[in-house]
């Protein structure tokens, strides 16, 4: 197969496995519905400076990530594809960066392609590519900043060096506008020790100032605009989203320091079996500048994230591109040496995982069925397991010829697994589909009420209105609700009957509840018994008609 055929096949695979599935499943709560609603509000309301969630101030992130998701909805429509396309584009650009950096480091087309393919099929990267979240975008900007740094350091002319440092500053600025100060910290963590090791600290001071200047020019217009609009933004964003999350005793998502070590291996599936040989080779080649640069890029951000109290799996996504390059470099070396041990081990690992998944599914179906009268979804999940097993078997039996078989396993997984979810998961985690089924009943509602932020944002996004009142819940909107002008946007349990009586005098009221506990059932019991009710799994929609005063 020549190069043109290879790239054509990869483009077809990209469309089939990454783009087609985007519209095949509802928005997951809480992240996808939140980001869809915030960006839609920007698109409809025209406020591109101050982020608002359900019409309330929401200062947990800057604005660039919302801009990109809003752009997707503006171009492709306010639909599932439009909401998710920004993540796919960001992932595709990161894959391209993996290819370009590997080509620059080793100047070998085969190694470049292997590195890009490994990165594109890492489970965490591929899985997040079809998920409307800010992490794929932020990961791209961090990747771009460090790729630009290497290009600047490896430049053969002053003009190329200036271009590299300028691009680094642009990437840091956009990363900051996407997720905050980490976009500045992570490149510094890598650049400082590497350039000190290379005795190029004068270059760091001189050209680094250019990168800082460019980053400030990118950030300052919005930073000043949001400060003028919302004077409390920077206090909340800096202390709540950075200091408390990193060092606070009450940090969200608190995990032990070693949380990311096993997760790193899981994130690399279906290539995790290559990790030992890749890390061993990196250790032997640690004195080579390209390998040292990649090792610092992998290890120092990983150490920083491990020291943070608040941890989520997606935080380590910026560490995966250098890992893919180290693994791809080691993989091609094994292929050239006809050394099949690591490849056989990886194939055996994937085969074992597939058999384990099949056994677990069979056990659950016999004891407590996950799929109940859902033959198509069960067939899809069996197809995913079968593809994973076939890929593992092929790589185990024919390691040198079928070295790329895990690509199929990963891509079939991301293409089919969302559609293979059992109904109980779909009903619980994607309420926008339930809302879409009842748009006719909801369109005329004067007031909207919900006891769950995920359900409320799904309701707001589907109806293109953010005025959903919160029923006995506050969650991450606690800050926005603290402003006096928004105090009526949340109704405590004790006041619900009085609130409903007043609201129904204005017009009909639509209430969307997620019933997951006894307290949720009590919330449902407090609603009036008249009107229409619709139920789907743990979702209940009550449409209460207008009453006369």
From Swiss-Prot:
<keyword id="KW-0812">Transmembrane</keyword>
<keyword id="KW-0448">Lipopolysaccharide biosynthesis</keyword>
<keyword id="KW-0443">Lipid metabolism</keyword>
<keyword id="KW-0997">Cell inner membrane</keyword>
<feature type="transmembrane region" description="Helical">
    <location>
        <begin position="256"/>
        <end position="276"/>
    </location>
</feature>
<feature type="transmembrane region" description="Helical">
    <location>
        <begin position="346"/>
        <end position="366"/>
    </location>
</feature>
<keyword id="KW-1003">Cell membrane</keyword>
<feature type="transmembrane region" description="Helical">
    <location>
        <begin position="136"/>
        <end position="156"/>
    </location>
</feature>
<comment type="pathway">
    <text>Lipopolysaccharide metabolism; 4-amino-4-deoxy-beta-L-arabinose-lipid A biosynthesis.</text>
</comment>
<dbReference type="GO" id="GO:0010041">
    <property type="term" value="P:response to iron(III) ion"/>
</dbReference>
<feature type="transmembrane region" description="Helical">
    <location>
        <begin position="80"/>
        <end position="100"/>
    </location>
</feature>
<keyword id="KW-0472">Membrane</keyword>
<feature type="transmembrane region" description="Helical">
    <location>
        <begin position="204"/>
        <end position="224"/>
    </location>
</feature>
<dbReference type="InterPro" id="IPR003342">
    <property type="entry name" value="Glyco_trans_39/83"/>
</dbReference>
<feature type="transmembrane region" description="Helical">
    <location>
        <begin position="9"/>
        <end position="29"/>
    </location>
</feature>
<feature type="transmembrane region" description="Helical">
    <location>
        <begin position="288"/>
        <end position="308"/>
    </location>
</feature>
<comment type="similarity">
    <text>Belongs to the glycosyltransferase 83 family.</text>
</comment>
<feature type="transmembrane region" description="Helical">
    <location>
        <begin position="112"/>
        <end position="132"/>
    </location>
</feature>
<feature type="transmembrane region" description="Helical">
    <location>
        <begin position="402"/>
        <end position="422"/>
    </location>
</feature>
<keyword id="KW-0808">Transferase</keyword>
<dbReference type="GO" id="GO:0009245">
    <property type="term" value="P:lipid A biosynthetic process"/>
</dbReference>
<keyword id="KW-1133">Transmembrane helix</keyword>
<keyword id="KW-0441">Lipid A biosynthesis</keyword>
<dbReference type="GO" id="GO:0000030">
    <property type="term" value="F:mannosyltransferase activity"/>
</dbReference>
<dbReference type="Pfam" id="PF02366">
    <property type="entry name" value="PMT"/>
</dbReference>
<dbReference type="GO" id="GO:0009103">
    <property type="term" value="P:lipopolysaccharide biosynthetic process"/>
</dbReference>
<dbReference type="InterPro" id="IPR050297">
    <property type="entry name" value="LipidA_mod_glycosyltrf_83"/>
</dbReference>
<dbReference type="GO" id="GO:0005886">
    <property type="term" value="C:plasma membrane"/>
</dbReference>
<keyword id="KW-0444">Lipid biosynthesis</keyword>
<feature type="transmembrane region" description="Helical">
    <location>
        <begin position="176"/>
        <end position="196"/>
    </location>
</feature>
<comment type="function">
    <text>Catalyzes the transfer of the L-Ara4N moiety of the glycolipid undecaprenyl phosphate-alpha-L-Ara4N to lipid A. The modified arabinose is attached to lipid A and is required for resistance to polymyxin and cationic antimicrobial peptides.</text>
</comment>
<protein>
    <recommendedName>
        <fullName>Undecaprenyl phosphate-alpha-4-amino-4-deoxy-L-arabinose arabinosyl transferase</fullName>
        <ecNumber>2.4.2.43</ecNumber>
    </recommendedName>
</protein>
<feature type="transmembrane region" description="Helical">
    <location>
        <begin position="376"/>
        <end position="396"/>
    </location>
</feature>
<dbReference type="GO" id="GO:0103015">
    <property type="term" value="F:4-amino-4-deoxy-L-arabinose transferase activity"/>
</dbReference>
<dbReference type="GO" id="GO:0006493">
    <property type="term" value="P:protein O-linked glycosylation"/>
</dbReference>
<feature type="transmembrane region" description="Helical">
    <location>
        <begin position="312"/>
        <end position="332"/>
    </location>
</feature>
<dbReference type="InterPro" id="IPR022839">
    <property type="entry name" value="ArnT_tfrase"/>
</dbReference>
<keyword id="KW-0328">Glycosyltransferase</keyword>
